[in-house]
Regions:
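Short, surface-exposed, charged amphipathic helix/loop patches that serve as local interaction elements
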Residues: 2-108
Length: 108
């Protein structure tokens, strides 16, 4: 099995123990993250006639632990990201968790 990854380029680098980081590579999480941390979000499918849409209700404390598991950067350091960069990373992580993005995304 090939593990999916997603790379996010930050608009502002974050400071880590190994220097400034301007890209974050997220790896598909393992089941262990769910066992140890719980659910990072709840997903609701909302029927709107012919089209459905999906809403996410995030638990940001749990998602921070997932991000650490997925990229190897401590959540305290990830907390130094700008809000806009966090939203990019959060969206990339969400797509990896639900299986719709990465190096080998599922067919549409």
């Amino acid at each position: 099995m090939i593990m999916s990854t997603s790379t996010v380029t930050l608009s502002t680098p974050i400071k880590t123990h190994n220097g400034d980081v301007s890209t974050i590579v997220l790896k598909e999480p393992k089941a262990r993250s769910f066992f140890e941390h719980g659910e990072p979000f709840k997903m609701r499918v909302i029927n709107e006639g012919e089209r459905d849409r999906v809403e996410f209700d995030y638990n940001h404390k749990i998602l921070a632990k997932f991000l650490t598991d997925m990229c190897g950067i401590d959540d305290m350091l990830l907390g130094g990201m700008s809000a806009s960069d966090y939203f990019l990373v959060r969206n990339a992580a969400t797509n990896l968790i639900v299986g719709v993005a990465g190096t080998d995304p599922l067919p549409a």
